[in-house]
Amino acid sequence: MSHGPLRVGIGGPVGAGKTTLTEKLCAALAHRCSMAVITNDIYTREDAEALMRAQVLPAERIRGVETGGCPHTAIREDASINLAAVADLRRAFPDLDLILIESGGDNLAATFSPELADLTLYVIDTAAGQDIPRKRGPGLARSDLLVVNKTDLAPHVGVDLRLLEEDTKTARGRRPYVMAQLRRGAGVAEIVAFLEREGGLQLLPQE
């Protein structure tokens, strides 16, 4: 893209699976494009360190940002700390095709500044309850792609998966969503295809 690498924001509540999604996308894409990751944590760099431990990307391609206070501010109202990390990565790796920007855990109102992210993925957790899609919120309703994670847990937490998907369709309108089990890799291929289709991400053929 003319302004540099595709920048993809990954948001969602604490524990929904944002870091798992980031890890799975790195595993699927690192050998097919030049990519990097920025993680946002309030007071630590735990998510960045978790990705380094998983060895899905070289450590120098991962930046951990400590947002302090409200993590929502660092991706929306004042994204300067994240924009500085983007600029730093672009200087270090001029050939970058993709930067994933993982937000700190936040509520259903979290959204990314258009200045920071070209596309937004929003992750929700099936185990959080049957009524999550009905609560809407900008992240859930208006993100470019909604990822309904941990669908395998539905029978264990009293969630009717068919009804959950119906409510998700209603909340999303024409916007796409994926029913996923990210730890098992289910749904990752659909998310990659979305990034290619909607983000214009150019990938090398799979080996």
From Swiss-Prot:
Alphabetized InterPro entries for the sequence: CobW/HypB/UreG_nucleotide-bd (IPR003495), P-loop_NTPase (IPR027417), UreG (IPR004400)
Chain positions recorded as GTP binding sites: 12-19
Primary location group: cytoplasm
A GO-annotated cellular component: cytoplasm
Lipoprotein found in the keyword field: no
Record-annotated disulphide pairs: none
GO biological process: urea catabolic process
Keywords: Chaperone, Cytoplasm, GTP-binding, Nickel insertion, Nucleotide-binding
Origin: domain of life: Bacteria
Subcellular location as annotated: Cytoplasm
Keyword Chaperone: yes
Cross-referenced Pfam families: cobW (PF02492)
GO molecular function terms noted in the UniProt entry: GTP binding; GTPase activity; nickel cation binding
Quaternary state and interactors: Homodimer. UreD, UreF and UreG form a complex that acts as a GTP-hydrolysis-dependent molecular chaperone, activating the urease apoprotein by helping to assemble the nickel containing metallocenter of UreC. The UreE protein probably delivers the nickel.
Recorded family membership: Belongs to the SIMIBI class G3E GTPase family. UreG subfamily.
Function comment: Facilitates the functional incorporation of the urease nickel metallocenter. This process requires GTP hydrolysis, probably effectuated by UreG.
Entry protein name: Urease accessory protein UreG
Lineage: Bacteria, Pseudomonadati, Pseudomonadota, Alphaproteobacteria, Rhodobacterales
